[in-house]
Regions:
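Aromatic pocket-lining residues of Rossmann-like dinucleotide-binding sites
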Residues: 49
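A conserved short coil-to-beta-strand element within the FAD-binding core of flavoproteins
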Residues: 172
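S-adenosyl-L-methionine
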Residues: 1-39, 44-45
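Class I S-adenosyl-L-methionine-dependent methyltransferase module
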Residues: 52-169
Length: 172
């Protein structure tokens, strides 16, 4: 199963086998079928869909779309993600208030610049894997209070998720 790099509460990972069983038993020609998903979210369902034809995805969250568009055009890749997370992880680990000062810096930067890398960081460093925005569209989730969040193993896991998701995106 492809696990997406974006972390979010309520991810449908456990439903993917059931959804795919329903699709597989539908009798449709999956080689020519289209996959249309208006609420892509983290992408776990779409990235694992058995449909081989054209995929059309959307979401009301422009940051999700921007992140996956970056993966599609190659500007977001395992190497750039590793470089970013290693740098930001070190800053988080050495930041005052057990990392909270740096978390706020990234959050404030994201709210101004909307970087897909900052979006990924916040989805992984935010409390309980939640994703929420206030009425102004600003990130509105507190820090998970784990300054050592971005260990080498965790960064590798995220980079592997970027790589496997990218392969699916580029195969269609």
């Amino acid at each position: 199963m492809i696990v997406p790099p974006i972390k979010s509460q309520g991810i449908k990972t456990k439903l993917v086998p059931w959804i795919n069983d329903v699709i597989d038993s539908s009798g449709l020609n999956l080689d020519d079928a289209q996959w249309i998903e208006p609420f892509f979210g983290t992408g776990v369902v779409g990235l694992n869909a058995p449909v081989k034809g054209h995929h059309i995805v959307g979401d009301t969250n422009p940051h999700i779309i921007c992140f996956y568009e970056g993966m599609k055009n190659g500007s977001i890749n395992p190497f750039s993600v590793r470089e970013y997370l290693e740098r930001e992880g070190k800053l988080l680990l050495t930041s005052k208030e057990d990392g909270y000062v740096h978390f706020r810096e990234v959050r404030d930067r994201f709210n101004q610049e909307h970087s897909p890398y900052d979006f990924l960081f916040l989805s992984r460093a935010g409390f309980n894997g939640m994703m929420r925005f206030n009425r102004h569209g600003d990130w509105n989730i507190p820090f998970c209070k784990k300054p050592n969040r971005f260990t080498p193993a965790y960064i590798t896991k995220i980079c592997n998720q970027v790589a496997s998701s990218s392969r699916v995106i580029h195969s269609g």
